[in-house]
Amino acid sequence: MLLPWLILIPFIGGFLCWQTERFGVKVPRWIALITMGLTLALSLQLWLQGGYSLTQSAGIPQWQSEFDMPWIPRFGISIHLAIDGLSLLMVVLTGLLGVLAVLCSWKEIEKYQGFFHLNLMWILGGVIGVFLAIDMFLFFFFWEMMLVPMYFLIALWGHKASDGKTRITAATKFFIYTQASGLVMLIAILALVFVHYNATGVWTFNYEELLNTPMSSGVEYLLMLGFFIAFAVKMPVVPLHGWLPDAHSQAPTAGSVDLAGILLKTAAYGLLRFSLPLFPNASAEFAPIAMWLGVIGIFYGAWMAFAQTDIKRLIAYTSVSHMGFVLIAIYTGSQLAYQGAVIQMIAHGLSAAGLFILCGQLYERIHTRDMRMMGGLWSKMKWLPALSLFFAVATLGMPGTGNFVGEFMILFGSFQVVPVITVISTFGLVFASVYSLAMLHRAYFGKAKSQIASQELPGMSLRELFMILLLVVLLVLLGFYPQPILDTSHSAIGNIQQWFVNSVTTTRP
């Protein structure tokens, strides 16, 4: 019975934030913080109940906790929520980054506090819904629902980019890309339900029943592409990434933390949970193309990151590069690579959130994100440059951080399946060190390039230090002791891999 509350608490909290703004600007902040704290506590409570590492019978999805209530029975639509090790880890990550998103916008957001927190809470509620929904209609409902508040977050509270583009442009671009891709997925979901109805005479949107839908290989390939396009836009996969750099560079800090830390993960989760098990043969056929797209993403993201002058755009392109590794892992069919992908998703969520929070703190002090205006900042403020150095080396996959474990497991698992692609993508790690260190050098070393950068700047407050040090501790912990994550995700990931590999060997009619 905890599952519906994981989704309801952020929605109710967001509504309260909006309505209590009249009692003072601090009230919505505290309500939002308590709301996300409660959501995180509930998800940790579910984790502590355990049972996630039990072995499962292959090919049958088994959930640790489930909630099912009829919604539109005539079409077989129900409010069907379920959690296993994979979705649990994503929900915990959402809760944690939700708390940090509220904290990092404590001083940054000054206008429409209540409405800001309404949008922030509803994005997080929608994301948790995506991770828990097992009814395809409900999944699509939450998938679309998290887009509208994100649009408002960028359009109303965004910053003007250093290249002069406006926040409205960025928000509209984000909305058009994601709406168009969502429409493609809706068509694919409806077509899948219709194919199932033709075969069985039963209308259903239930994921477990749709898993065994008999269909021809041509139909399966088309439907798989519908799902893949929707997830590829959100992930983002080159060449469908056009919305990401603009959305990141114009979004407020909380928006960037949510985008990089959580929203991109919904796409990787969608591929693992829906795309592979529903269309295993088509996915296996499409795998080489998807992996090469991942390789292109790794190099394109790295080169574009190196060329940026806006520090937030640089970090946005690093996300394109890192998610390329995850895409390669998803299509290998190797359990080791899958577990690496889960660790990489969590580590990237933490390290990207850290970098964006530090960017926000830097922007509050010098009021620019243009690295051509920085330089020489290392000696001008306490803590912030040194912590930026930590997150930069975490991003390039330094041993001892979670990013290294994730990338190593992905490359190790993929090498057995696609050695050529693995060897080529390894060079992407070299480029990662180039753009990470270039960012540090341009911003913190050398001579001060403007009046702003040459004056003494205030150090970090306790709130700012707490957020960043929490992320540092978690990343190092993940780097040295990833076992709890591996144990939790093991059976869920093993199940997806079994389904994918077994179905490929015993092809459909």
From Swiss-Prot:
Residues 22-29, 104-121, 195-221, 280-285, 335-339, 447-464 are cytoplasmic. Its EC number is 7.1.1.-. The keyword Cell membrane applies. It is a multi-pass membrane protein. One of its GO terms (biological process) is respiratory electron transport chain. Keywords: Cell inner membrane, Cell membrane, Membrane, NAD, Quinone, Translocase, Transmembrane, Transmembrane helix, Ubiquinone. NDH-1 shuttles electrons from NADH, via FMN and iron-sulfur (Fe-S) centers, to quinones in the respiratory chain. The immediate electron acceptor for the enzyme in this species is believed to be ubiquinone. Couples the redox reaction to proton translocation (for every two electrons transferred, four hydrogen ions are translocated across the cytoplasmic membrane), and thus conserves the redox energy in a proton gradient. Belongs to the complex I subunit 4 family. This is NADH-quinone oxidoreductase subunit M. It comes from Escherichia coli (strain K12). The lineage of its organism: Bacteria, Pseudomonadati, Pseudomonadota, Gammaproteobacteria, Enterobacterales.
